[in-house]
């Protein structure tokens, strides 16, 4: 939002800058903490917000991958294509997330630290529609217009690289990367990513 408005600065942009500075001041005592489990626990979370950009009606994607409760990879970005529905936006976000997950899984296997090389990486999603599209493509003929590159997630699932898992919206750690949240909910998600305050 802030980056998109650098050409024409308005009062709302100054408000955004002030909010960012307040956030930085408020979070100066924040650290990223990883759990001390003996075995690595890797989880991925994906989310999307449907047509959140009021200027061009594009959706926002976000993902977070954690190892032992601490974030190791995350991304928030505007989707490059228009979505017709929330499920489609979530499916596109899941596909982009799956690519990162497959790369991470292979990297950890090459290092010899992935807990079980034959197990898929769990990718948590709060959209039943997106999960169904990824797992059962033959039942979704109305989504033929979705760009072919987003269907790569189906191959990842069939190869056993990724396993799509349903998660409740309130527990989806990627939620803050797609939209603004009330502060208590935002802080709950931050803690789930391994972000802790010095006072904790």
Region locations from a protein language model:
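C-terminal reverse transcriptase regions that engage the nucleic-acid substrate
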Residues: 1-29, 168, 176-178
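Conserved helix-loop functional segments at active or binding sites
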Residues: 26-30, 51, 71-74, 107-113
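RNase H-like nuclease fold core
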Residues: 45-87
């Amino acid at each position: 939002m802030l980056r998109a408005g650098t050409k024409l600065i308005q009062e709302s942009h100054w408000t955004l800058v002030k909010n960012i500075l307040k956030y930085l001041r408020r979070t100066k005592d924040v650290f990223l903490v990883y759990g001390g489990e003996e075995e690595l626990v890797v989880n991925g979370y994906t989310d999307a917000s449907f047509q959140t950009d009021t200027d061009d009606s594009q959706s926002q994607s976000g993902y977070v991958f954690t190892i032992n409760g601490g974030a190791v990879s995350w991304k928030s970005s505007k989707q490059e294509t228009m979505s017709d529905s929330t499920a489609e936006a979530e499916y596109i976000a899941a596909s982009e997330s799956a690519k990162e997950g497959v790369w991470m899984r292979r990297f950890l296997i090459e290092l010899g630290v992935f807990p079980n090389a034959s197990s898929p990486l769990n990718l948590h999603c709060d959209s039943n529609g997106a999960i169904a599209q990824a797992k059962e493509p033959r039942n979704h003929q109305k989504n033929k217009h979705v760009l072919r590159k987003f269907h790569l997630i189906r191959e990842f699932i069939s190869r056993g690289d990724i396993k799509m898992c349903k998660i409740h919206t309130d527990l989806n750690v990627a939620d803050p990367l797609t939209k603004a949240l009330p502060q208590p909910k935002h802080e709950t998600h931050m803690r789930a990513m391994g972000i802790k305050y010095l006072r904790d």
